[in-house]
């Protein structure tokens, strides 16, 4: 099974820059439609952009589900490891779904 390495330092809670100017009448942001495989390819050339996308989606999942995430030095590695597992099962899964599954697995209500 191919491992998706979305970068060990990928999950850093970043500001929500691409979500700030969102207007539903303009449709969903294009980042919403990125698959795990596409994010993996994109990370090879623009890891900062992928890190930001993952952080924004992760924050949205945590906030909308009111999850409690215990901050620790291992958090980034734990999130990336779980995200890689989820993406490896279905590389064509939307990244936002994979991140939501990951955050629900790590977080607590």
Curated annotation (Swiss-Prot):
This is Uncharacterized protein YmgD. Pfam families: YmgD (PF16456). It comes from Escherichia coli (strain K12). The keyword Plastid does not apply. InterPro entries: YmgD, YmgD_sf. The keyword Ribosomal protein does not apply. Keywords: Signal. GO terms for cellular component: outer membrane-bounded periplasmic space.
């Amino acid at each position: 099974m191919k491992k998706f390495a979305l970068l060990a330092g990928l999950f850093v809670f970043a500001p929500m820059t691409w979500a700030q100017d969102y207007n539903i009448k303009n449709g969903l942001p294009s980042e919403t439609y990125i698959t795990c495989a596409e994010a993996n390819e994109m990370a090879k050339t623009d890891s900062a952009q992928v890190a930001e996308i993952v952080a924004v989606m992760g924050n949205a999942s945590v906030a909308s589900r009111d999850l409690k995430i215990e901050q620790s030095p291992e958090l980034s590695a734990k999130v990336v490891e779980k995200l890689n597992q989820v993406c490896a099962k279905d590389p064509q899964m939307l990244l936002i779904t994979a991140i939501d599954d990951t955050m629900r697995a790590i977080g607590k209500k």
